């Protein structure tokens, strides 16, 4: 299965280690995985994937806001209606983590994506274990 892993860190920086671990877990199950950085790339390639996994961090500790790059990349990826997807949120703080995950799923569903799996990622090893469960 062709899977796109969209990396949406809270601030513009390189792809975090937990996103690479998630992709590594998916690849170990035989999937073809591409990591897309939401801060530097556009979403024009997204409709070509069978499954889309969004890995995000909350932009603020209070209120669970999502980074500005998330709605931008999802809006550019036209043709996402009905696309199966997963929402992964990196736990950065014990406060408002559920609200941040709900905001992530709301942004994805706004573009018509079907979120059939959501999870809070605790670290790189946890992300790799989650990646092995996709498509199983």
Could you tell me what each predicted segment is?
Residues 2-136:
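FMN-binding flavodoxin-like domain, especially the glycine-rich phosphate-binding loop
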């Amino acid at each position: 299965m062709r899977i796109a892993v969209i990396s949406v860190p809270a601030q513009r920086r390189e792809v975090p280690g937990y996103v690479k671990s998630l992709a590594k877990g998916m690849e170990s199950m035989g999937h073809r995985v591409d990591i897309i950085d939401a801060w530097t790339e556009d979403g024009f390639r997204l409709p070509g994937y069978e499954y889309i996994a969004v890995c995000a961090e909350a932009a603020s500790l209070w209120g669970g806001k999502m980074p500005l790059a998330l709605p931008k990349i999802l809006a550019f990826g036209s043709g996402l209606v009905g696309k199966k997807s997963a929402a992964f949120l990196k736990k950065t703080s014990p406060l408002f983590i559920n609200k941040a995950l709900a905001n992530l799923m709301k942004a994805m569903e706004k573009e018509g994506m079907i979120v059939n799996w959501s999870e809070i990622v605790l670290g790189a090893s946890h992300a790799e274990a989650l990646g092995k469960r996709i498509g199983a």
